[in-house]
A protein has these predicted regions:
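NAD(P)H-binding glycine-rich loop region in Rossmannoid oxidoreductase-like domains
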Residues: 1-5
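The catalytic Tyr-centered alpha-helix of NAD(P)H-dependent dehydrogenases
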Residues: 39, 50-57, 80, 88, ...
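Conserved catalytic Lys-bearing alpha helix of Rossmann-like short-chain dehydrogenase/reductases
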Residues: 7-13, 22, 55-65
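Conserved SDR Rossmann-fold cofactor-binding beta-strand/turn motif
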Residues: 29-30, 79-80, 84
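Conserved Rossmann-fold NAD(P)-dependent oxidoreductase catalytic core, especially the SDR/UDP-sugar
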Residues: 11-53
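Active-site Tyr-X1-5-Lys
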Residues: 36, 49-79, 104-105
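C-terminal substrate-binding subdomain of Rossmann-fold SDR/epimerase-dehydratase oxidoreductases
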Residues: 106-107, 111-206
Length: 206
């Protein structure tokens, strides 16, 4: 099912969009395509070493998109960090969101591992970037791949920040405890987003 949705259906979608007269295709890949890396800064040229099938197929779709690029069909790949922020249909499987949920509703945050680095990006910044890419000079973004990852923090540092903010926002409630457990999730990477900043001037606001 993962292959069917994330890989097999991708190229037919690109072809259908191109045949329908779509002029610009912005593909949301994932910064998780890098897997785990000990490099200080992971740039767009870093080898892709995905740790899951989902991220493997995300990476394999990138060259499929560029294969169909023409003068009238601008193709761009972005590799966003893990998103966070409020939504009407809240996702609670994302690092910042799930830790915040635990802090508010359990008054206890469970940290699995803790040393893993996880770049984050607010959902509103992601939406602002999509809007900017739709009107940006095509010559700047044609055939380009961009990291979009800021706030490179460890999972434990995120937990400590969530604890502080939630305690400040809920005075009088019980103190929030942090419980550390082992983890088999090895994803850890520090994303460098200098390229998109220098190319189109994108900076997160949230």
């Amino acid at each position: 099912l993962s292959r069917t949705i994330n890989f097999d259906a991708f190229e037919p979608l690109v072809i259908a969009a191109k045949n329908a007269g779509v002029e610009r295709f912005i593909y949301a890949s994932s910064s998780s395509v890098y897997g785990g890396s000990e490099k200080t800064d992971v740039t767009e040229s870093h080898p892709l070493v995905p740790l899951t099938l989902y991220n493997k197929y995300k990476g394999l779709c990138e060259p499929l998109l560029f294969k169909h690029e023409t003068e009238d069909f601008v193709c761009t790949v972005i590799r966003p960090a893990t998103l966070c922020g409020y939504a009407p249909r809240q996702r609670l499987d994302l690092t910042v969101n799930i830790l915040t949920n635990w802090a508010i509703n359990r008054r206890k945050i469970t940290v699995f591992g803790g040393s893993q680095l996880r770049p984050n990006l607010h959902i509103q910044d992601m939406c602002d970037l999509y809007k900017q890419l739709l009107i940006e000079d095509g010559r700047k973004i044609r055939g380009q791949t961009f990291n979009v990852g800021y706030q490179n923090m460890s999972v434990m540092d995120i937990a400590l920040l969530v604890k502080r903010v939630v305690q400040e926002e809920t005075p009088g409630e019980a103190d929030i405890r942090i419980e550390k457990c082992s983890s088999d999730d090895l994803r850890s990477y520090h994303i460098n987003s200098d390229k998109i900043r220098k190319t189109i001037g994108f900076e997160p606001k949230y």
